[in-house]
Amino acid sequence: MKIALGCDHIVTDTKMRVSEFLKSKGHEVIDVGTYDFTRTHYPIFGKKVGEQVVSGNADLGVCICGTGVGINNAVNKVPGVRSALVRDMTSALYAKEELNANVIGFGGRIIGELLMCDIIDAFINAEYKATEENKKLIAKIKHLETSNADQADPHFFDEFLEKWDRGEYHD
C-alpha cells in the first residue's frame, strides 16, 4: 500500500521512524516532508499529504506535528480528505471502519512512537464497513467541504514563507 507521510519540523525524527516502520511492513512511503528541523509551517505538509491521497497517488495518509491538532486541521481542508486525530486504537478503528477515514493524524509529542506505529498498522489493515447510515453521514460531511481555486496553487504558502524569511514570525 502507498502511504503519504508528512510532518512539521518538531517531529521530523518521529516521522523518519514511522517511515522505516511502514517500509518494514512492505508499504511504499511517499514522504512529502519536512526533512529536517528547520522551522516551517505544518499546513504546507498537511496539504501535501491530503493532495497525495485525494489524487490517488497514495492510498492513505499519515500526518504528524507536535500536538497533531494543527496539521490535522490543515489536512482536513483538502477536499476529499477525511482525517481523524487519534491517540488510541479505538478512535483510529472507528475513523476507518465507520467514517472511511483516508488520513490519520498524530501528536508526535503526545503519543509514543510504538503506540503510534501499532495504531497506524491497525488503521491500514482495518476496512470500511459501509452502511446506509454511515454513507449518508459521510455524504453530509462531504457537503460541508469548501473548495477554493487557490488551494491547487503550488505557491499557496509562499507569502508566509517569505514573511518567515524576513524574520516577521517567531516561535
Curated annotation (Swiss-Prot):
GO terms for biological process: D-allose catabolic process; galactose catabolic process; lactose catabolic process via tagatose-6-phosphate; pentose-phosphate shunt, non-oxidative branch. Keywords: Isomerase, Lactose metabolism. InterPro entries: LacB (IPR004784), RpiB_LacA_LacB (IPR003500), RpiB_LacA_LacB_sf (IPR036569). Coiled coil: none annotated. Pathway: Carbohydrate metabolism; D-galactose 6-phosphate degradation; D-tagatose 6-phosphate from D-galactose 6-phosphate: step 1/1. It comes from the Bacteria. Pfam families: LacAB_rpiB. Transmembrane segments: none annotated. GO terms for molecular function: galactose-6-phosphate isomerase activity; ribose-5-phosphate isomerase activity. Its EC number is 5.3.1.26. It catalyses: aldehydo-D-galactose 6-phosphate = keto-D-tagatose 6-phosphate. Heteromultimeric protein consisting of LacA and LacB. Belongs to the LacAB/RpiB family. This is Galactose-6-phosphate isomerase subunit LacB. The gene is lacB.
